[in-house]
Amino acid sequence: MPAYRPPHIASSEITPKSFYLSRRNFLGTAAGLAAIGLAGREAIAAPLSAKPGAYKLDEKLTPLDAVTSYNNFYEFGVGKSDPKENSGKFKPTPWTVKVDGLVSKPQEFGIEELMKYPLEERTYRMRCVEGWSMVIPWIGFPLSALLDKVEPLGSAKYVSFETVVRPEEMPGQSGLFQPLSWPYVEGLRLDEARHPLTILAVGLYGETLPNQNGAPIRLVVPWKYGFKGIKSIMRISLVEKQPETTWKNSNAREYGFYSNVNPHVDHPRWSQATEQRIGEGGFFGTQNRPTLMFNGYDDVASLYTGLDLKANY
């Protein structure tokens, strides 16, 4: 991944938390569904209604402009600004998510159906493997709720996820030389996927997901590095063996399957002991802060009892 460079954010572009919280009271699910239903058009941010989730943070939110303009989404290009600049032609509707594999009831879910799940707002830390972080108010629902619908078989041990392949709409997927193999694939153990912290997000900052942030639906696993949060999901499969994930296949020495946030296991090319929080600039720019084990979500530690987290990075 490219080296980290903190973005410049004009003060006029920063969404104050107080404004966001007051505006959220006027948001409605109907408007969100209406925008999702605009088939064949560019994604239009629309308000969503969500109940407050059980997981909250008493930390400053990352400015909305930074969340939507400083992204890794290689399907639109490898630069941090590429996803915002190059995703205008991407069509997040119509959209279906196929859930298959080792399940009793394989199904396809339209995005309109998924948007009708009881939505929660979850404010999570997001830690990128590159050494920077954000605090983002996501809107979504537990992945376990979707898995319950399809009834995984006893032989299912892992969950595999795939991003859509549309080179005509995603310029990072076209061209002779590709940075990665497509489709983008990620995976979790089934117990990780079922953990209450793991969600499928359909919005952020009170509105539907922008294209550059993974519209119309993406994975959020807050105790893992950000690249595990696969975007624009079109297929979820229950499988018996560990999925062959994209970054691990690209460079297994640098990107492991688990990729839990761990300040004690460095990336081969940089330390993971500290991070730079986007949007928190001091006199000398963005300041370093200590990285927390599991990104501060200690209740997942029991998932890895007896597992060597250095060998299984």
Curated annotation (Swiss-Prot):
- Annotated CDD domains: YedY_like_Moco (cd02107)
Cofactor comment: Binds 1 Mo-molybdopterin (Mo-MPT) cofactor per subunit.
Q: What highest taxon heads this organism's lineage?
A: Bacteria
> What GO terms in the biological process aspect are recorded for it?
protein repair
Which coenzymes or cofactors are required?
Answer: Mo-molybdopterin
Provide the E.C. number(s) assigned to this enzyme: 1.8.5.-
| Keyword presence, Transcription | no
Q: Which reaction does it catalyse?
A: L-methionyl-[protein] + a quinone + H2O = L-methionyl-(S)-S-oxide-[protein] + a quinol; L-methionyl-[protein] + a quinone + H2O = L-methionyl-(R)-S-oxide-[protein] + a quinol
Spell out the molecular function terms from Gene Ontology. Answer: metal ion binding; molybdopterin cofactor binding; oxidoreductase activity, acting on a sulfur group of donors, quinone or similar compound as acceptor
- From which residue to which does the signal peptide run? 1-45
Q: Which UniProt keywords apply?
A: Metal-binding, Molybdenum, Oxidoreductase, Periplasm, Signal
Give the chief site where it resides.
Answer: periplasm
Q: Which residues cross the membrane?
A: none
Q: How is it modified after translation?
A: Predicted to be exported by the Tat system. The position of the signal peptide cleavage has not been experimentally proven.
Q: Name one Pfam family in it.
A: Oxidored_molyb
Write out the annotated subcellular location: Periplasm
Looking at the keywords, is Oxidoreductase present?
yes
Question: What cellular component terms from Gene Ontology apply here?
Answer: periplasmic space
UniProt binding sites for Mo-molybdopterin: N71, Y74, E75, C128, T163, N213, R218, G229, I230, K231
Q: How does it assemble?
A: Heterodimer of a catalytic subunit (MsrP) and a heme-binding subunit (MsrQ).
What the record says about family reads:
Belongs to the MsrP family.
Matching entries from HAMAP family are given as:
MsrP
* PANTHER family membership: PROTEIN-METHIONINE-SULFOXIDE REDUCTASE, PROTEIN-METHIONINE-SULFOXIDE REDUCTASE CATALYTIC SUBUNIT MSRP
Its function? Part of the MsrPQ system that repairs oxidized periplasmic proteins containing methionine sulfoxide residues (Met-O), using respiratory chain electrons. Thus protects these proteins from oxidative-stress damage caused by reactive species of oxygen and chlorine generated by the host defense mechanisms. MsrPQ is essential for the maintenance of envelope integrity under bleach stress, rescuing a wide series of structurally unrelated periplasmic proteins from methionine oxidation.
Provide the protein name. Protein-methionine-sulfoxide reductase catalytic subunit MsrP
Natural source organism: Agrobacterium fabrum (strain C58 / ATCC 33970)
Gene of this entry: msrP
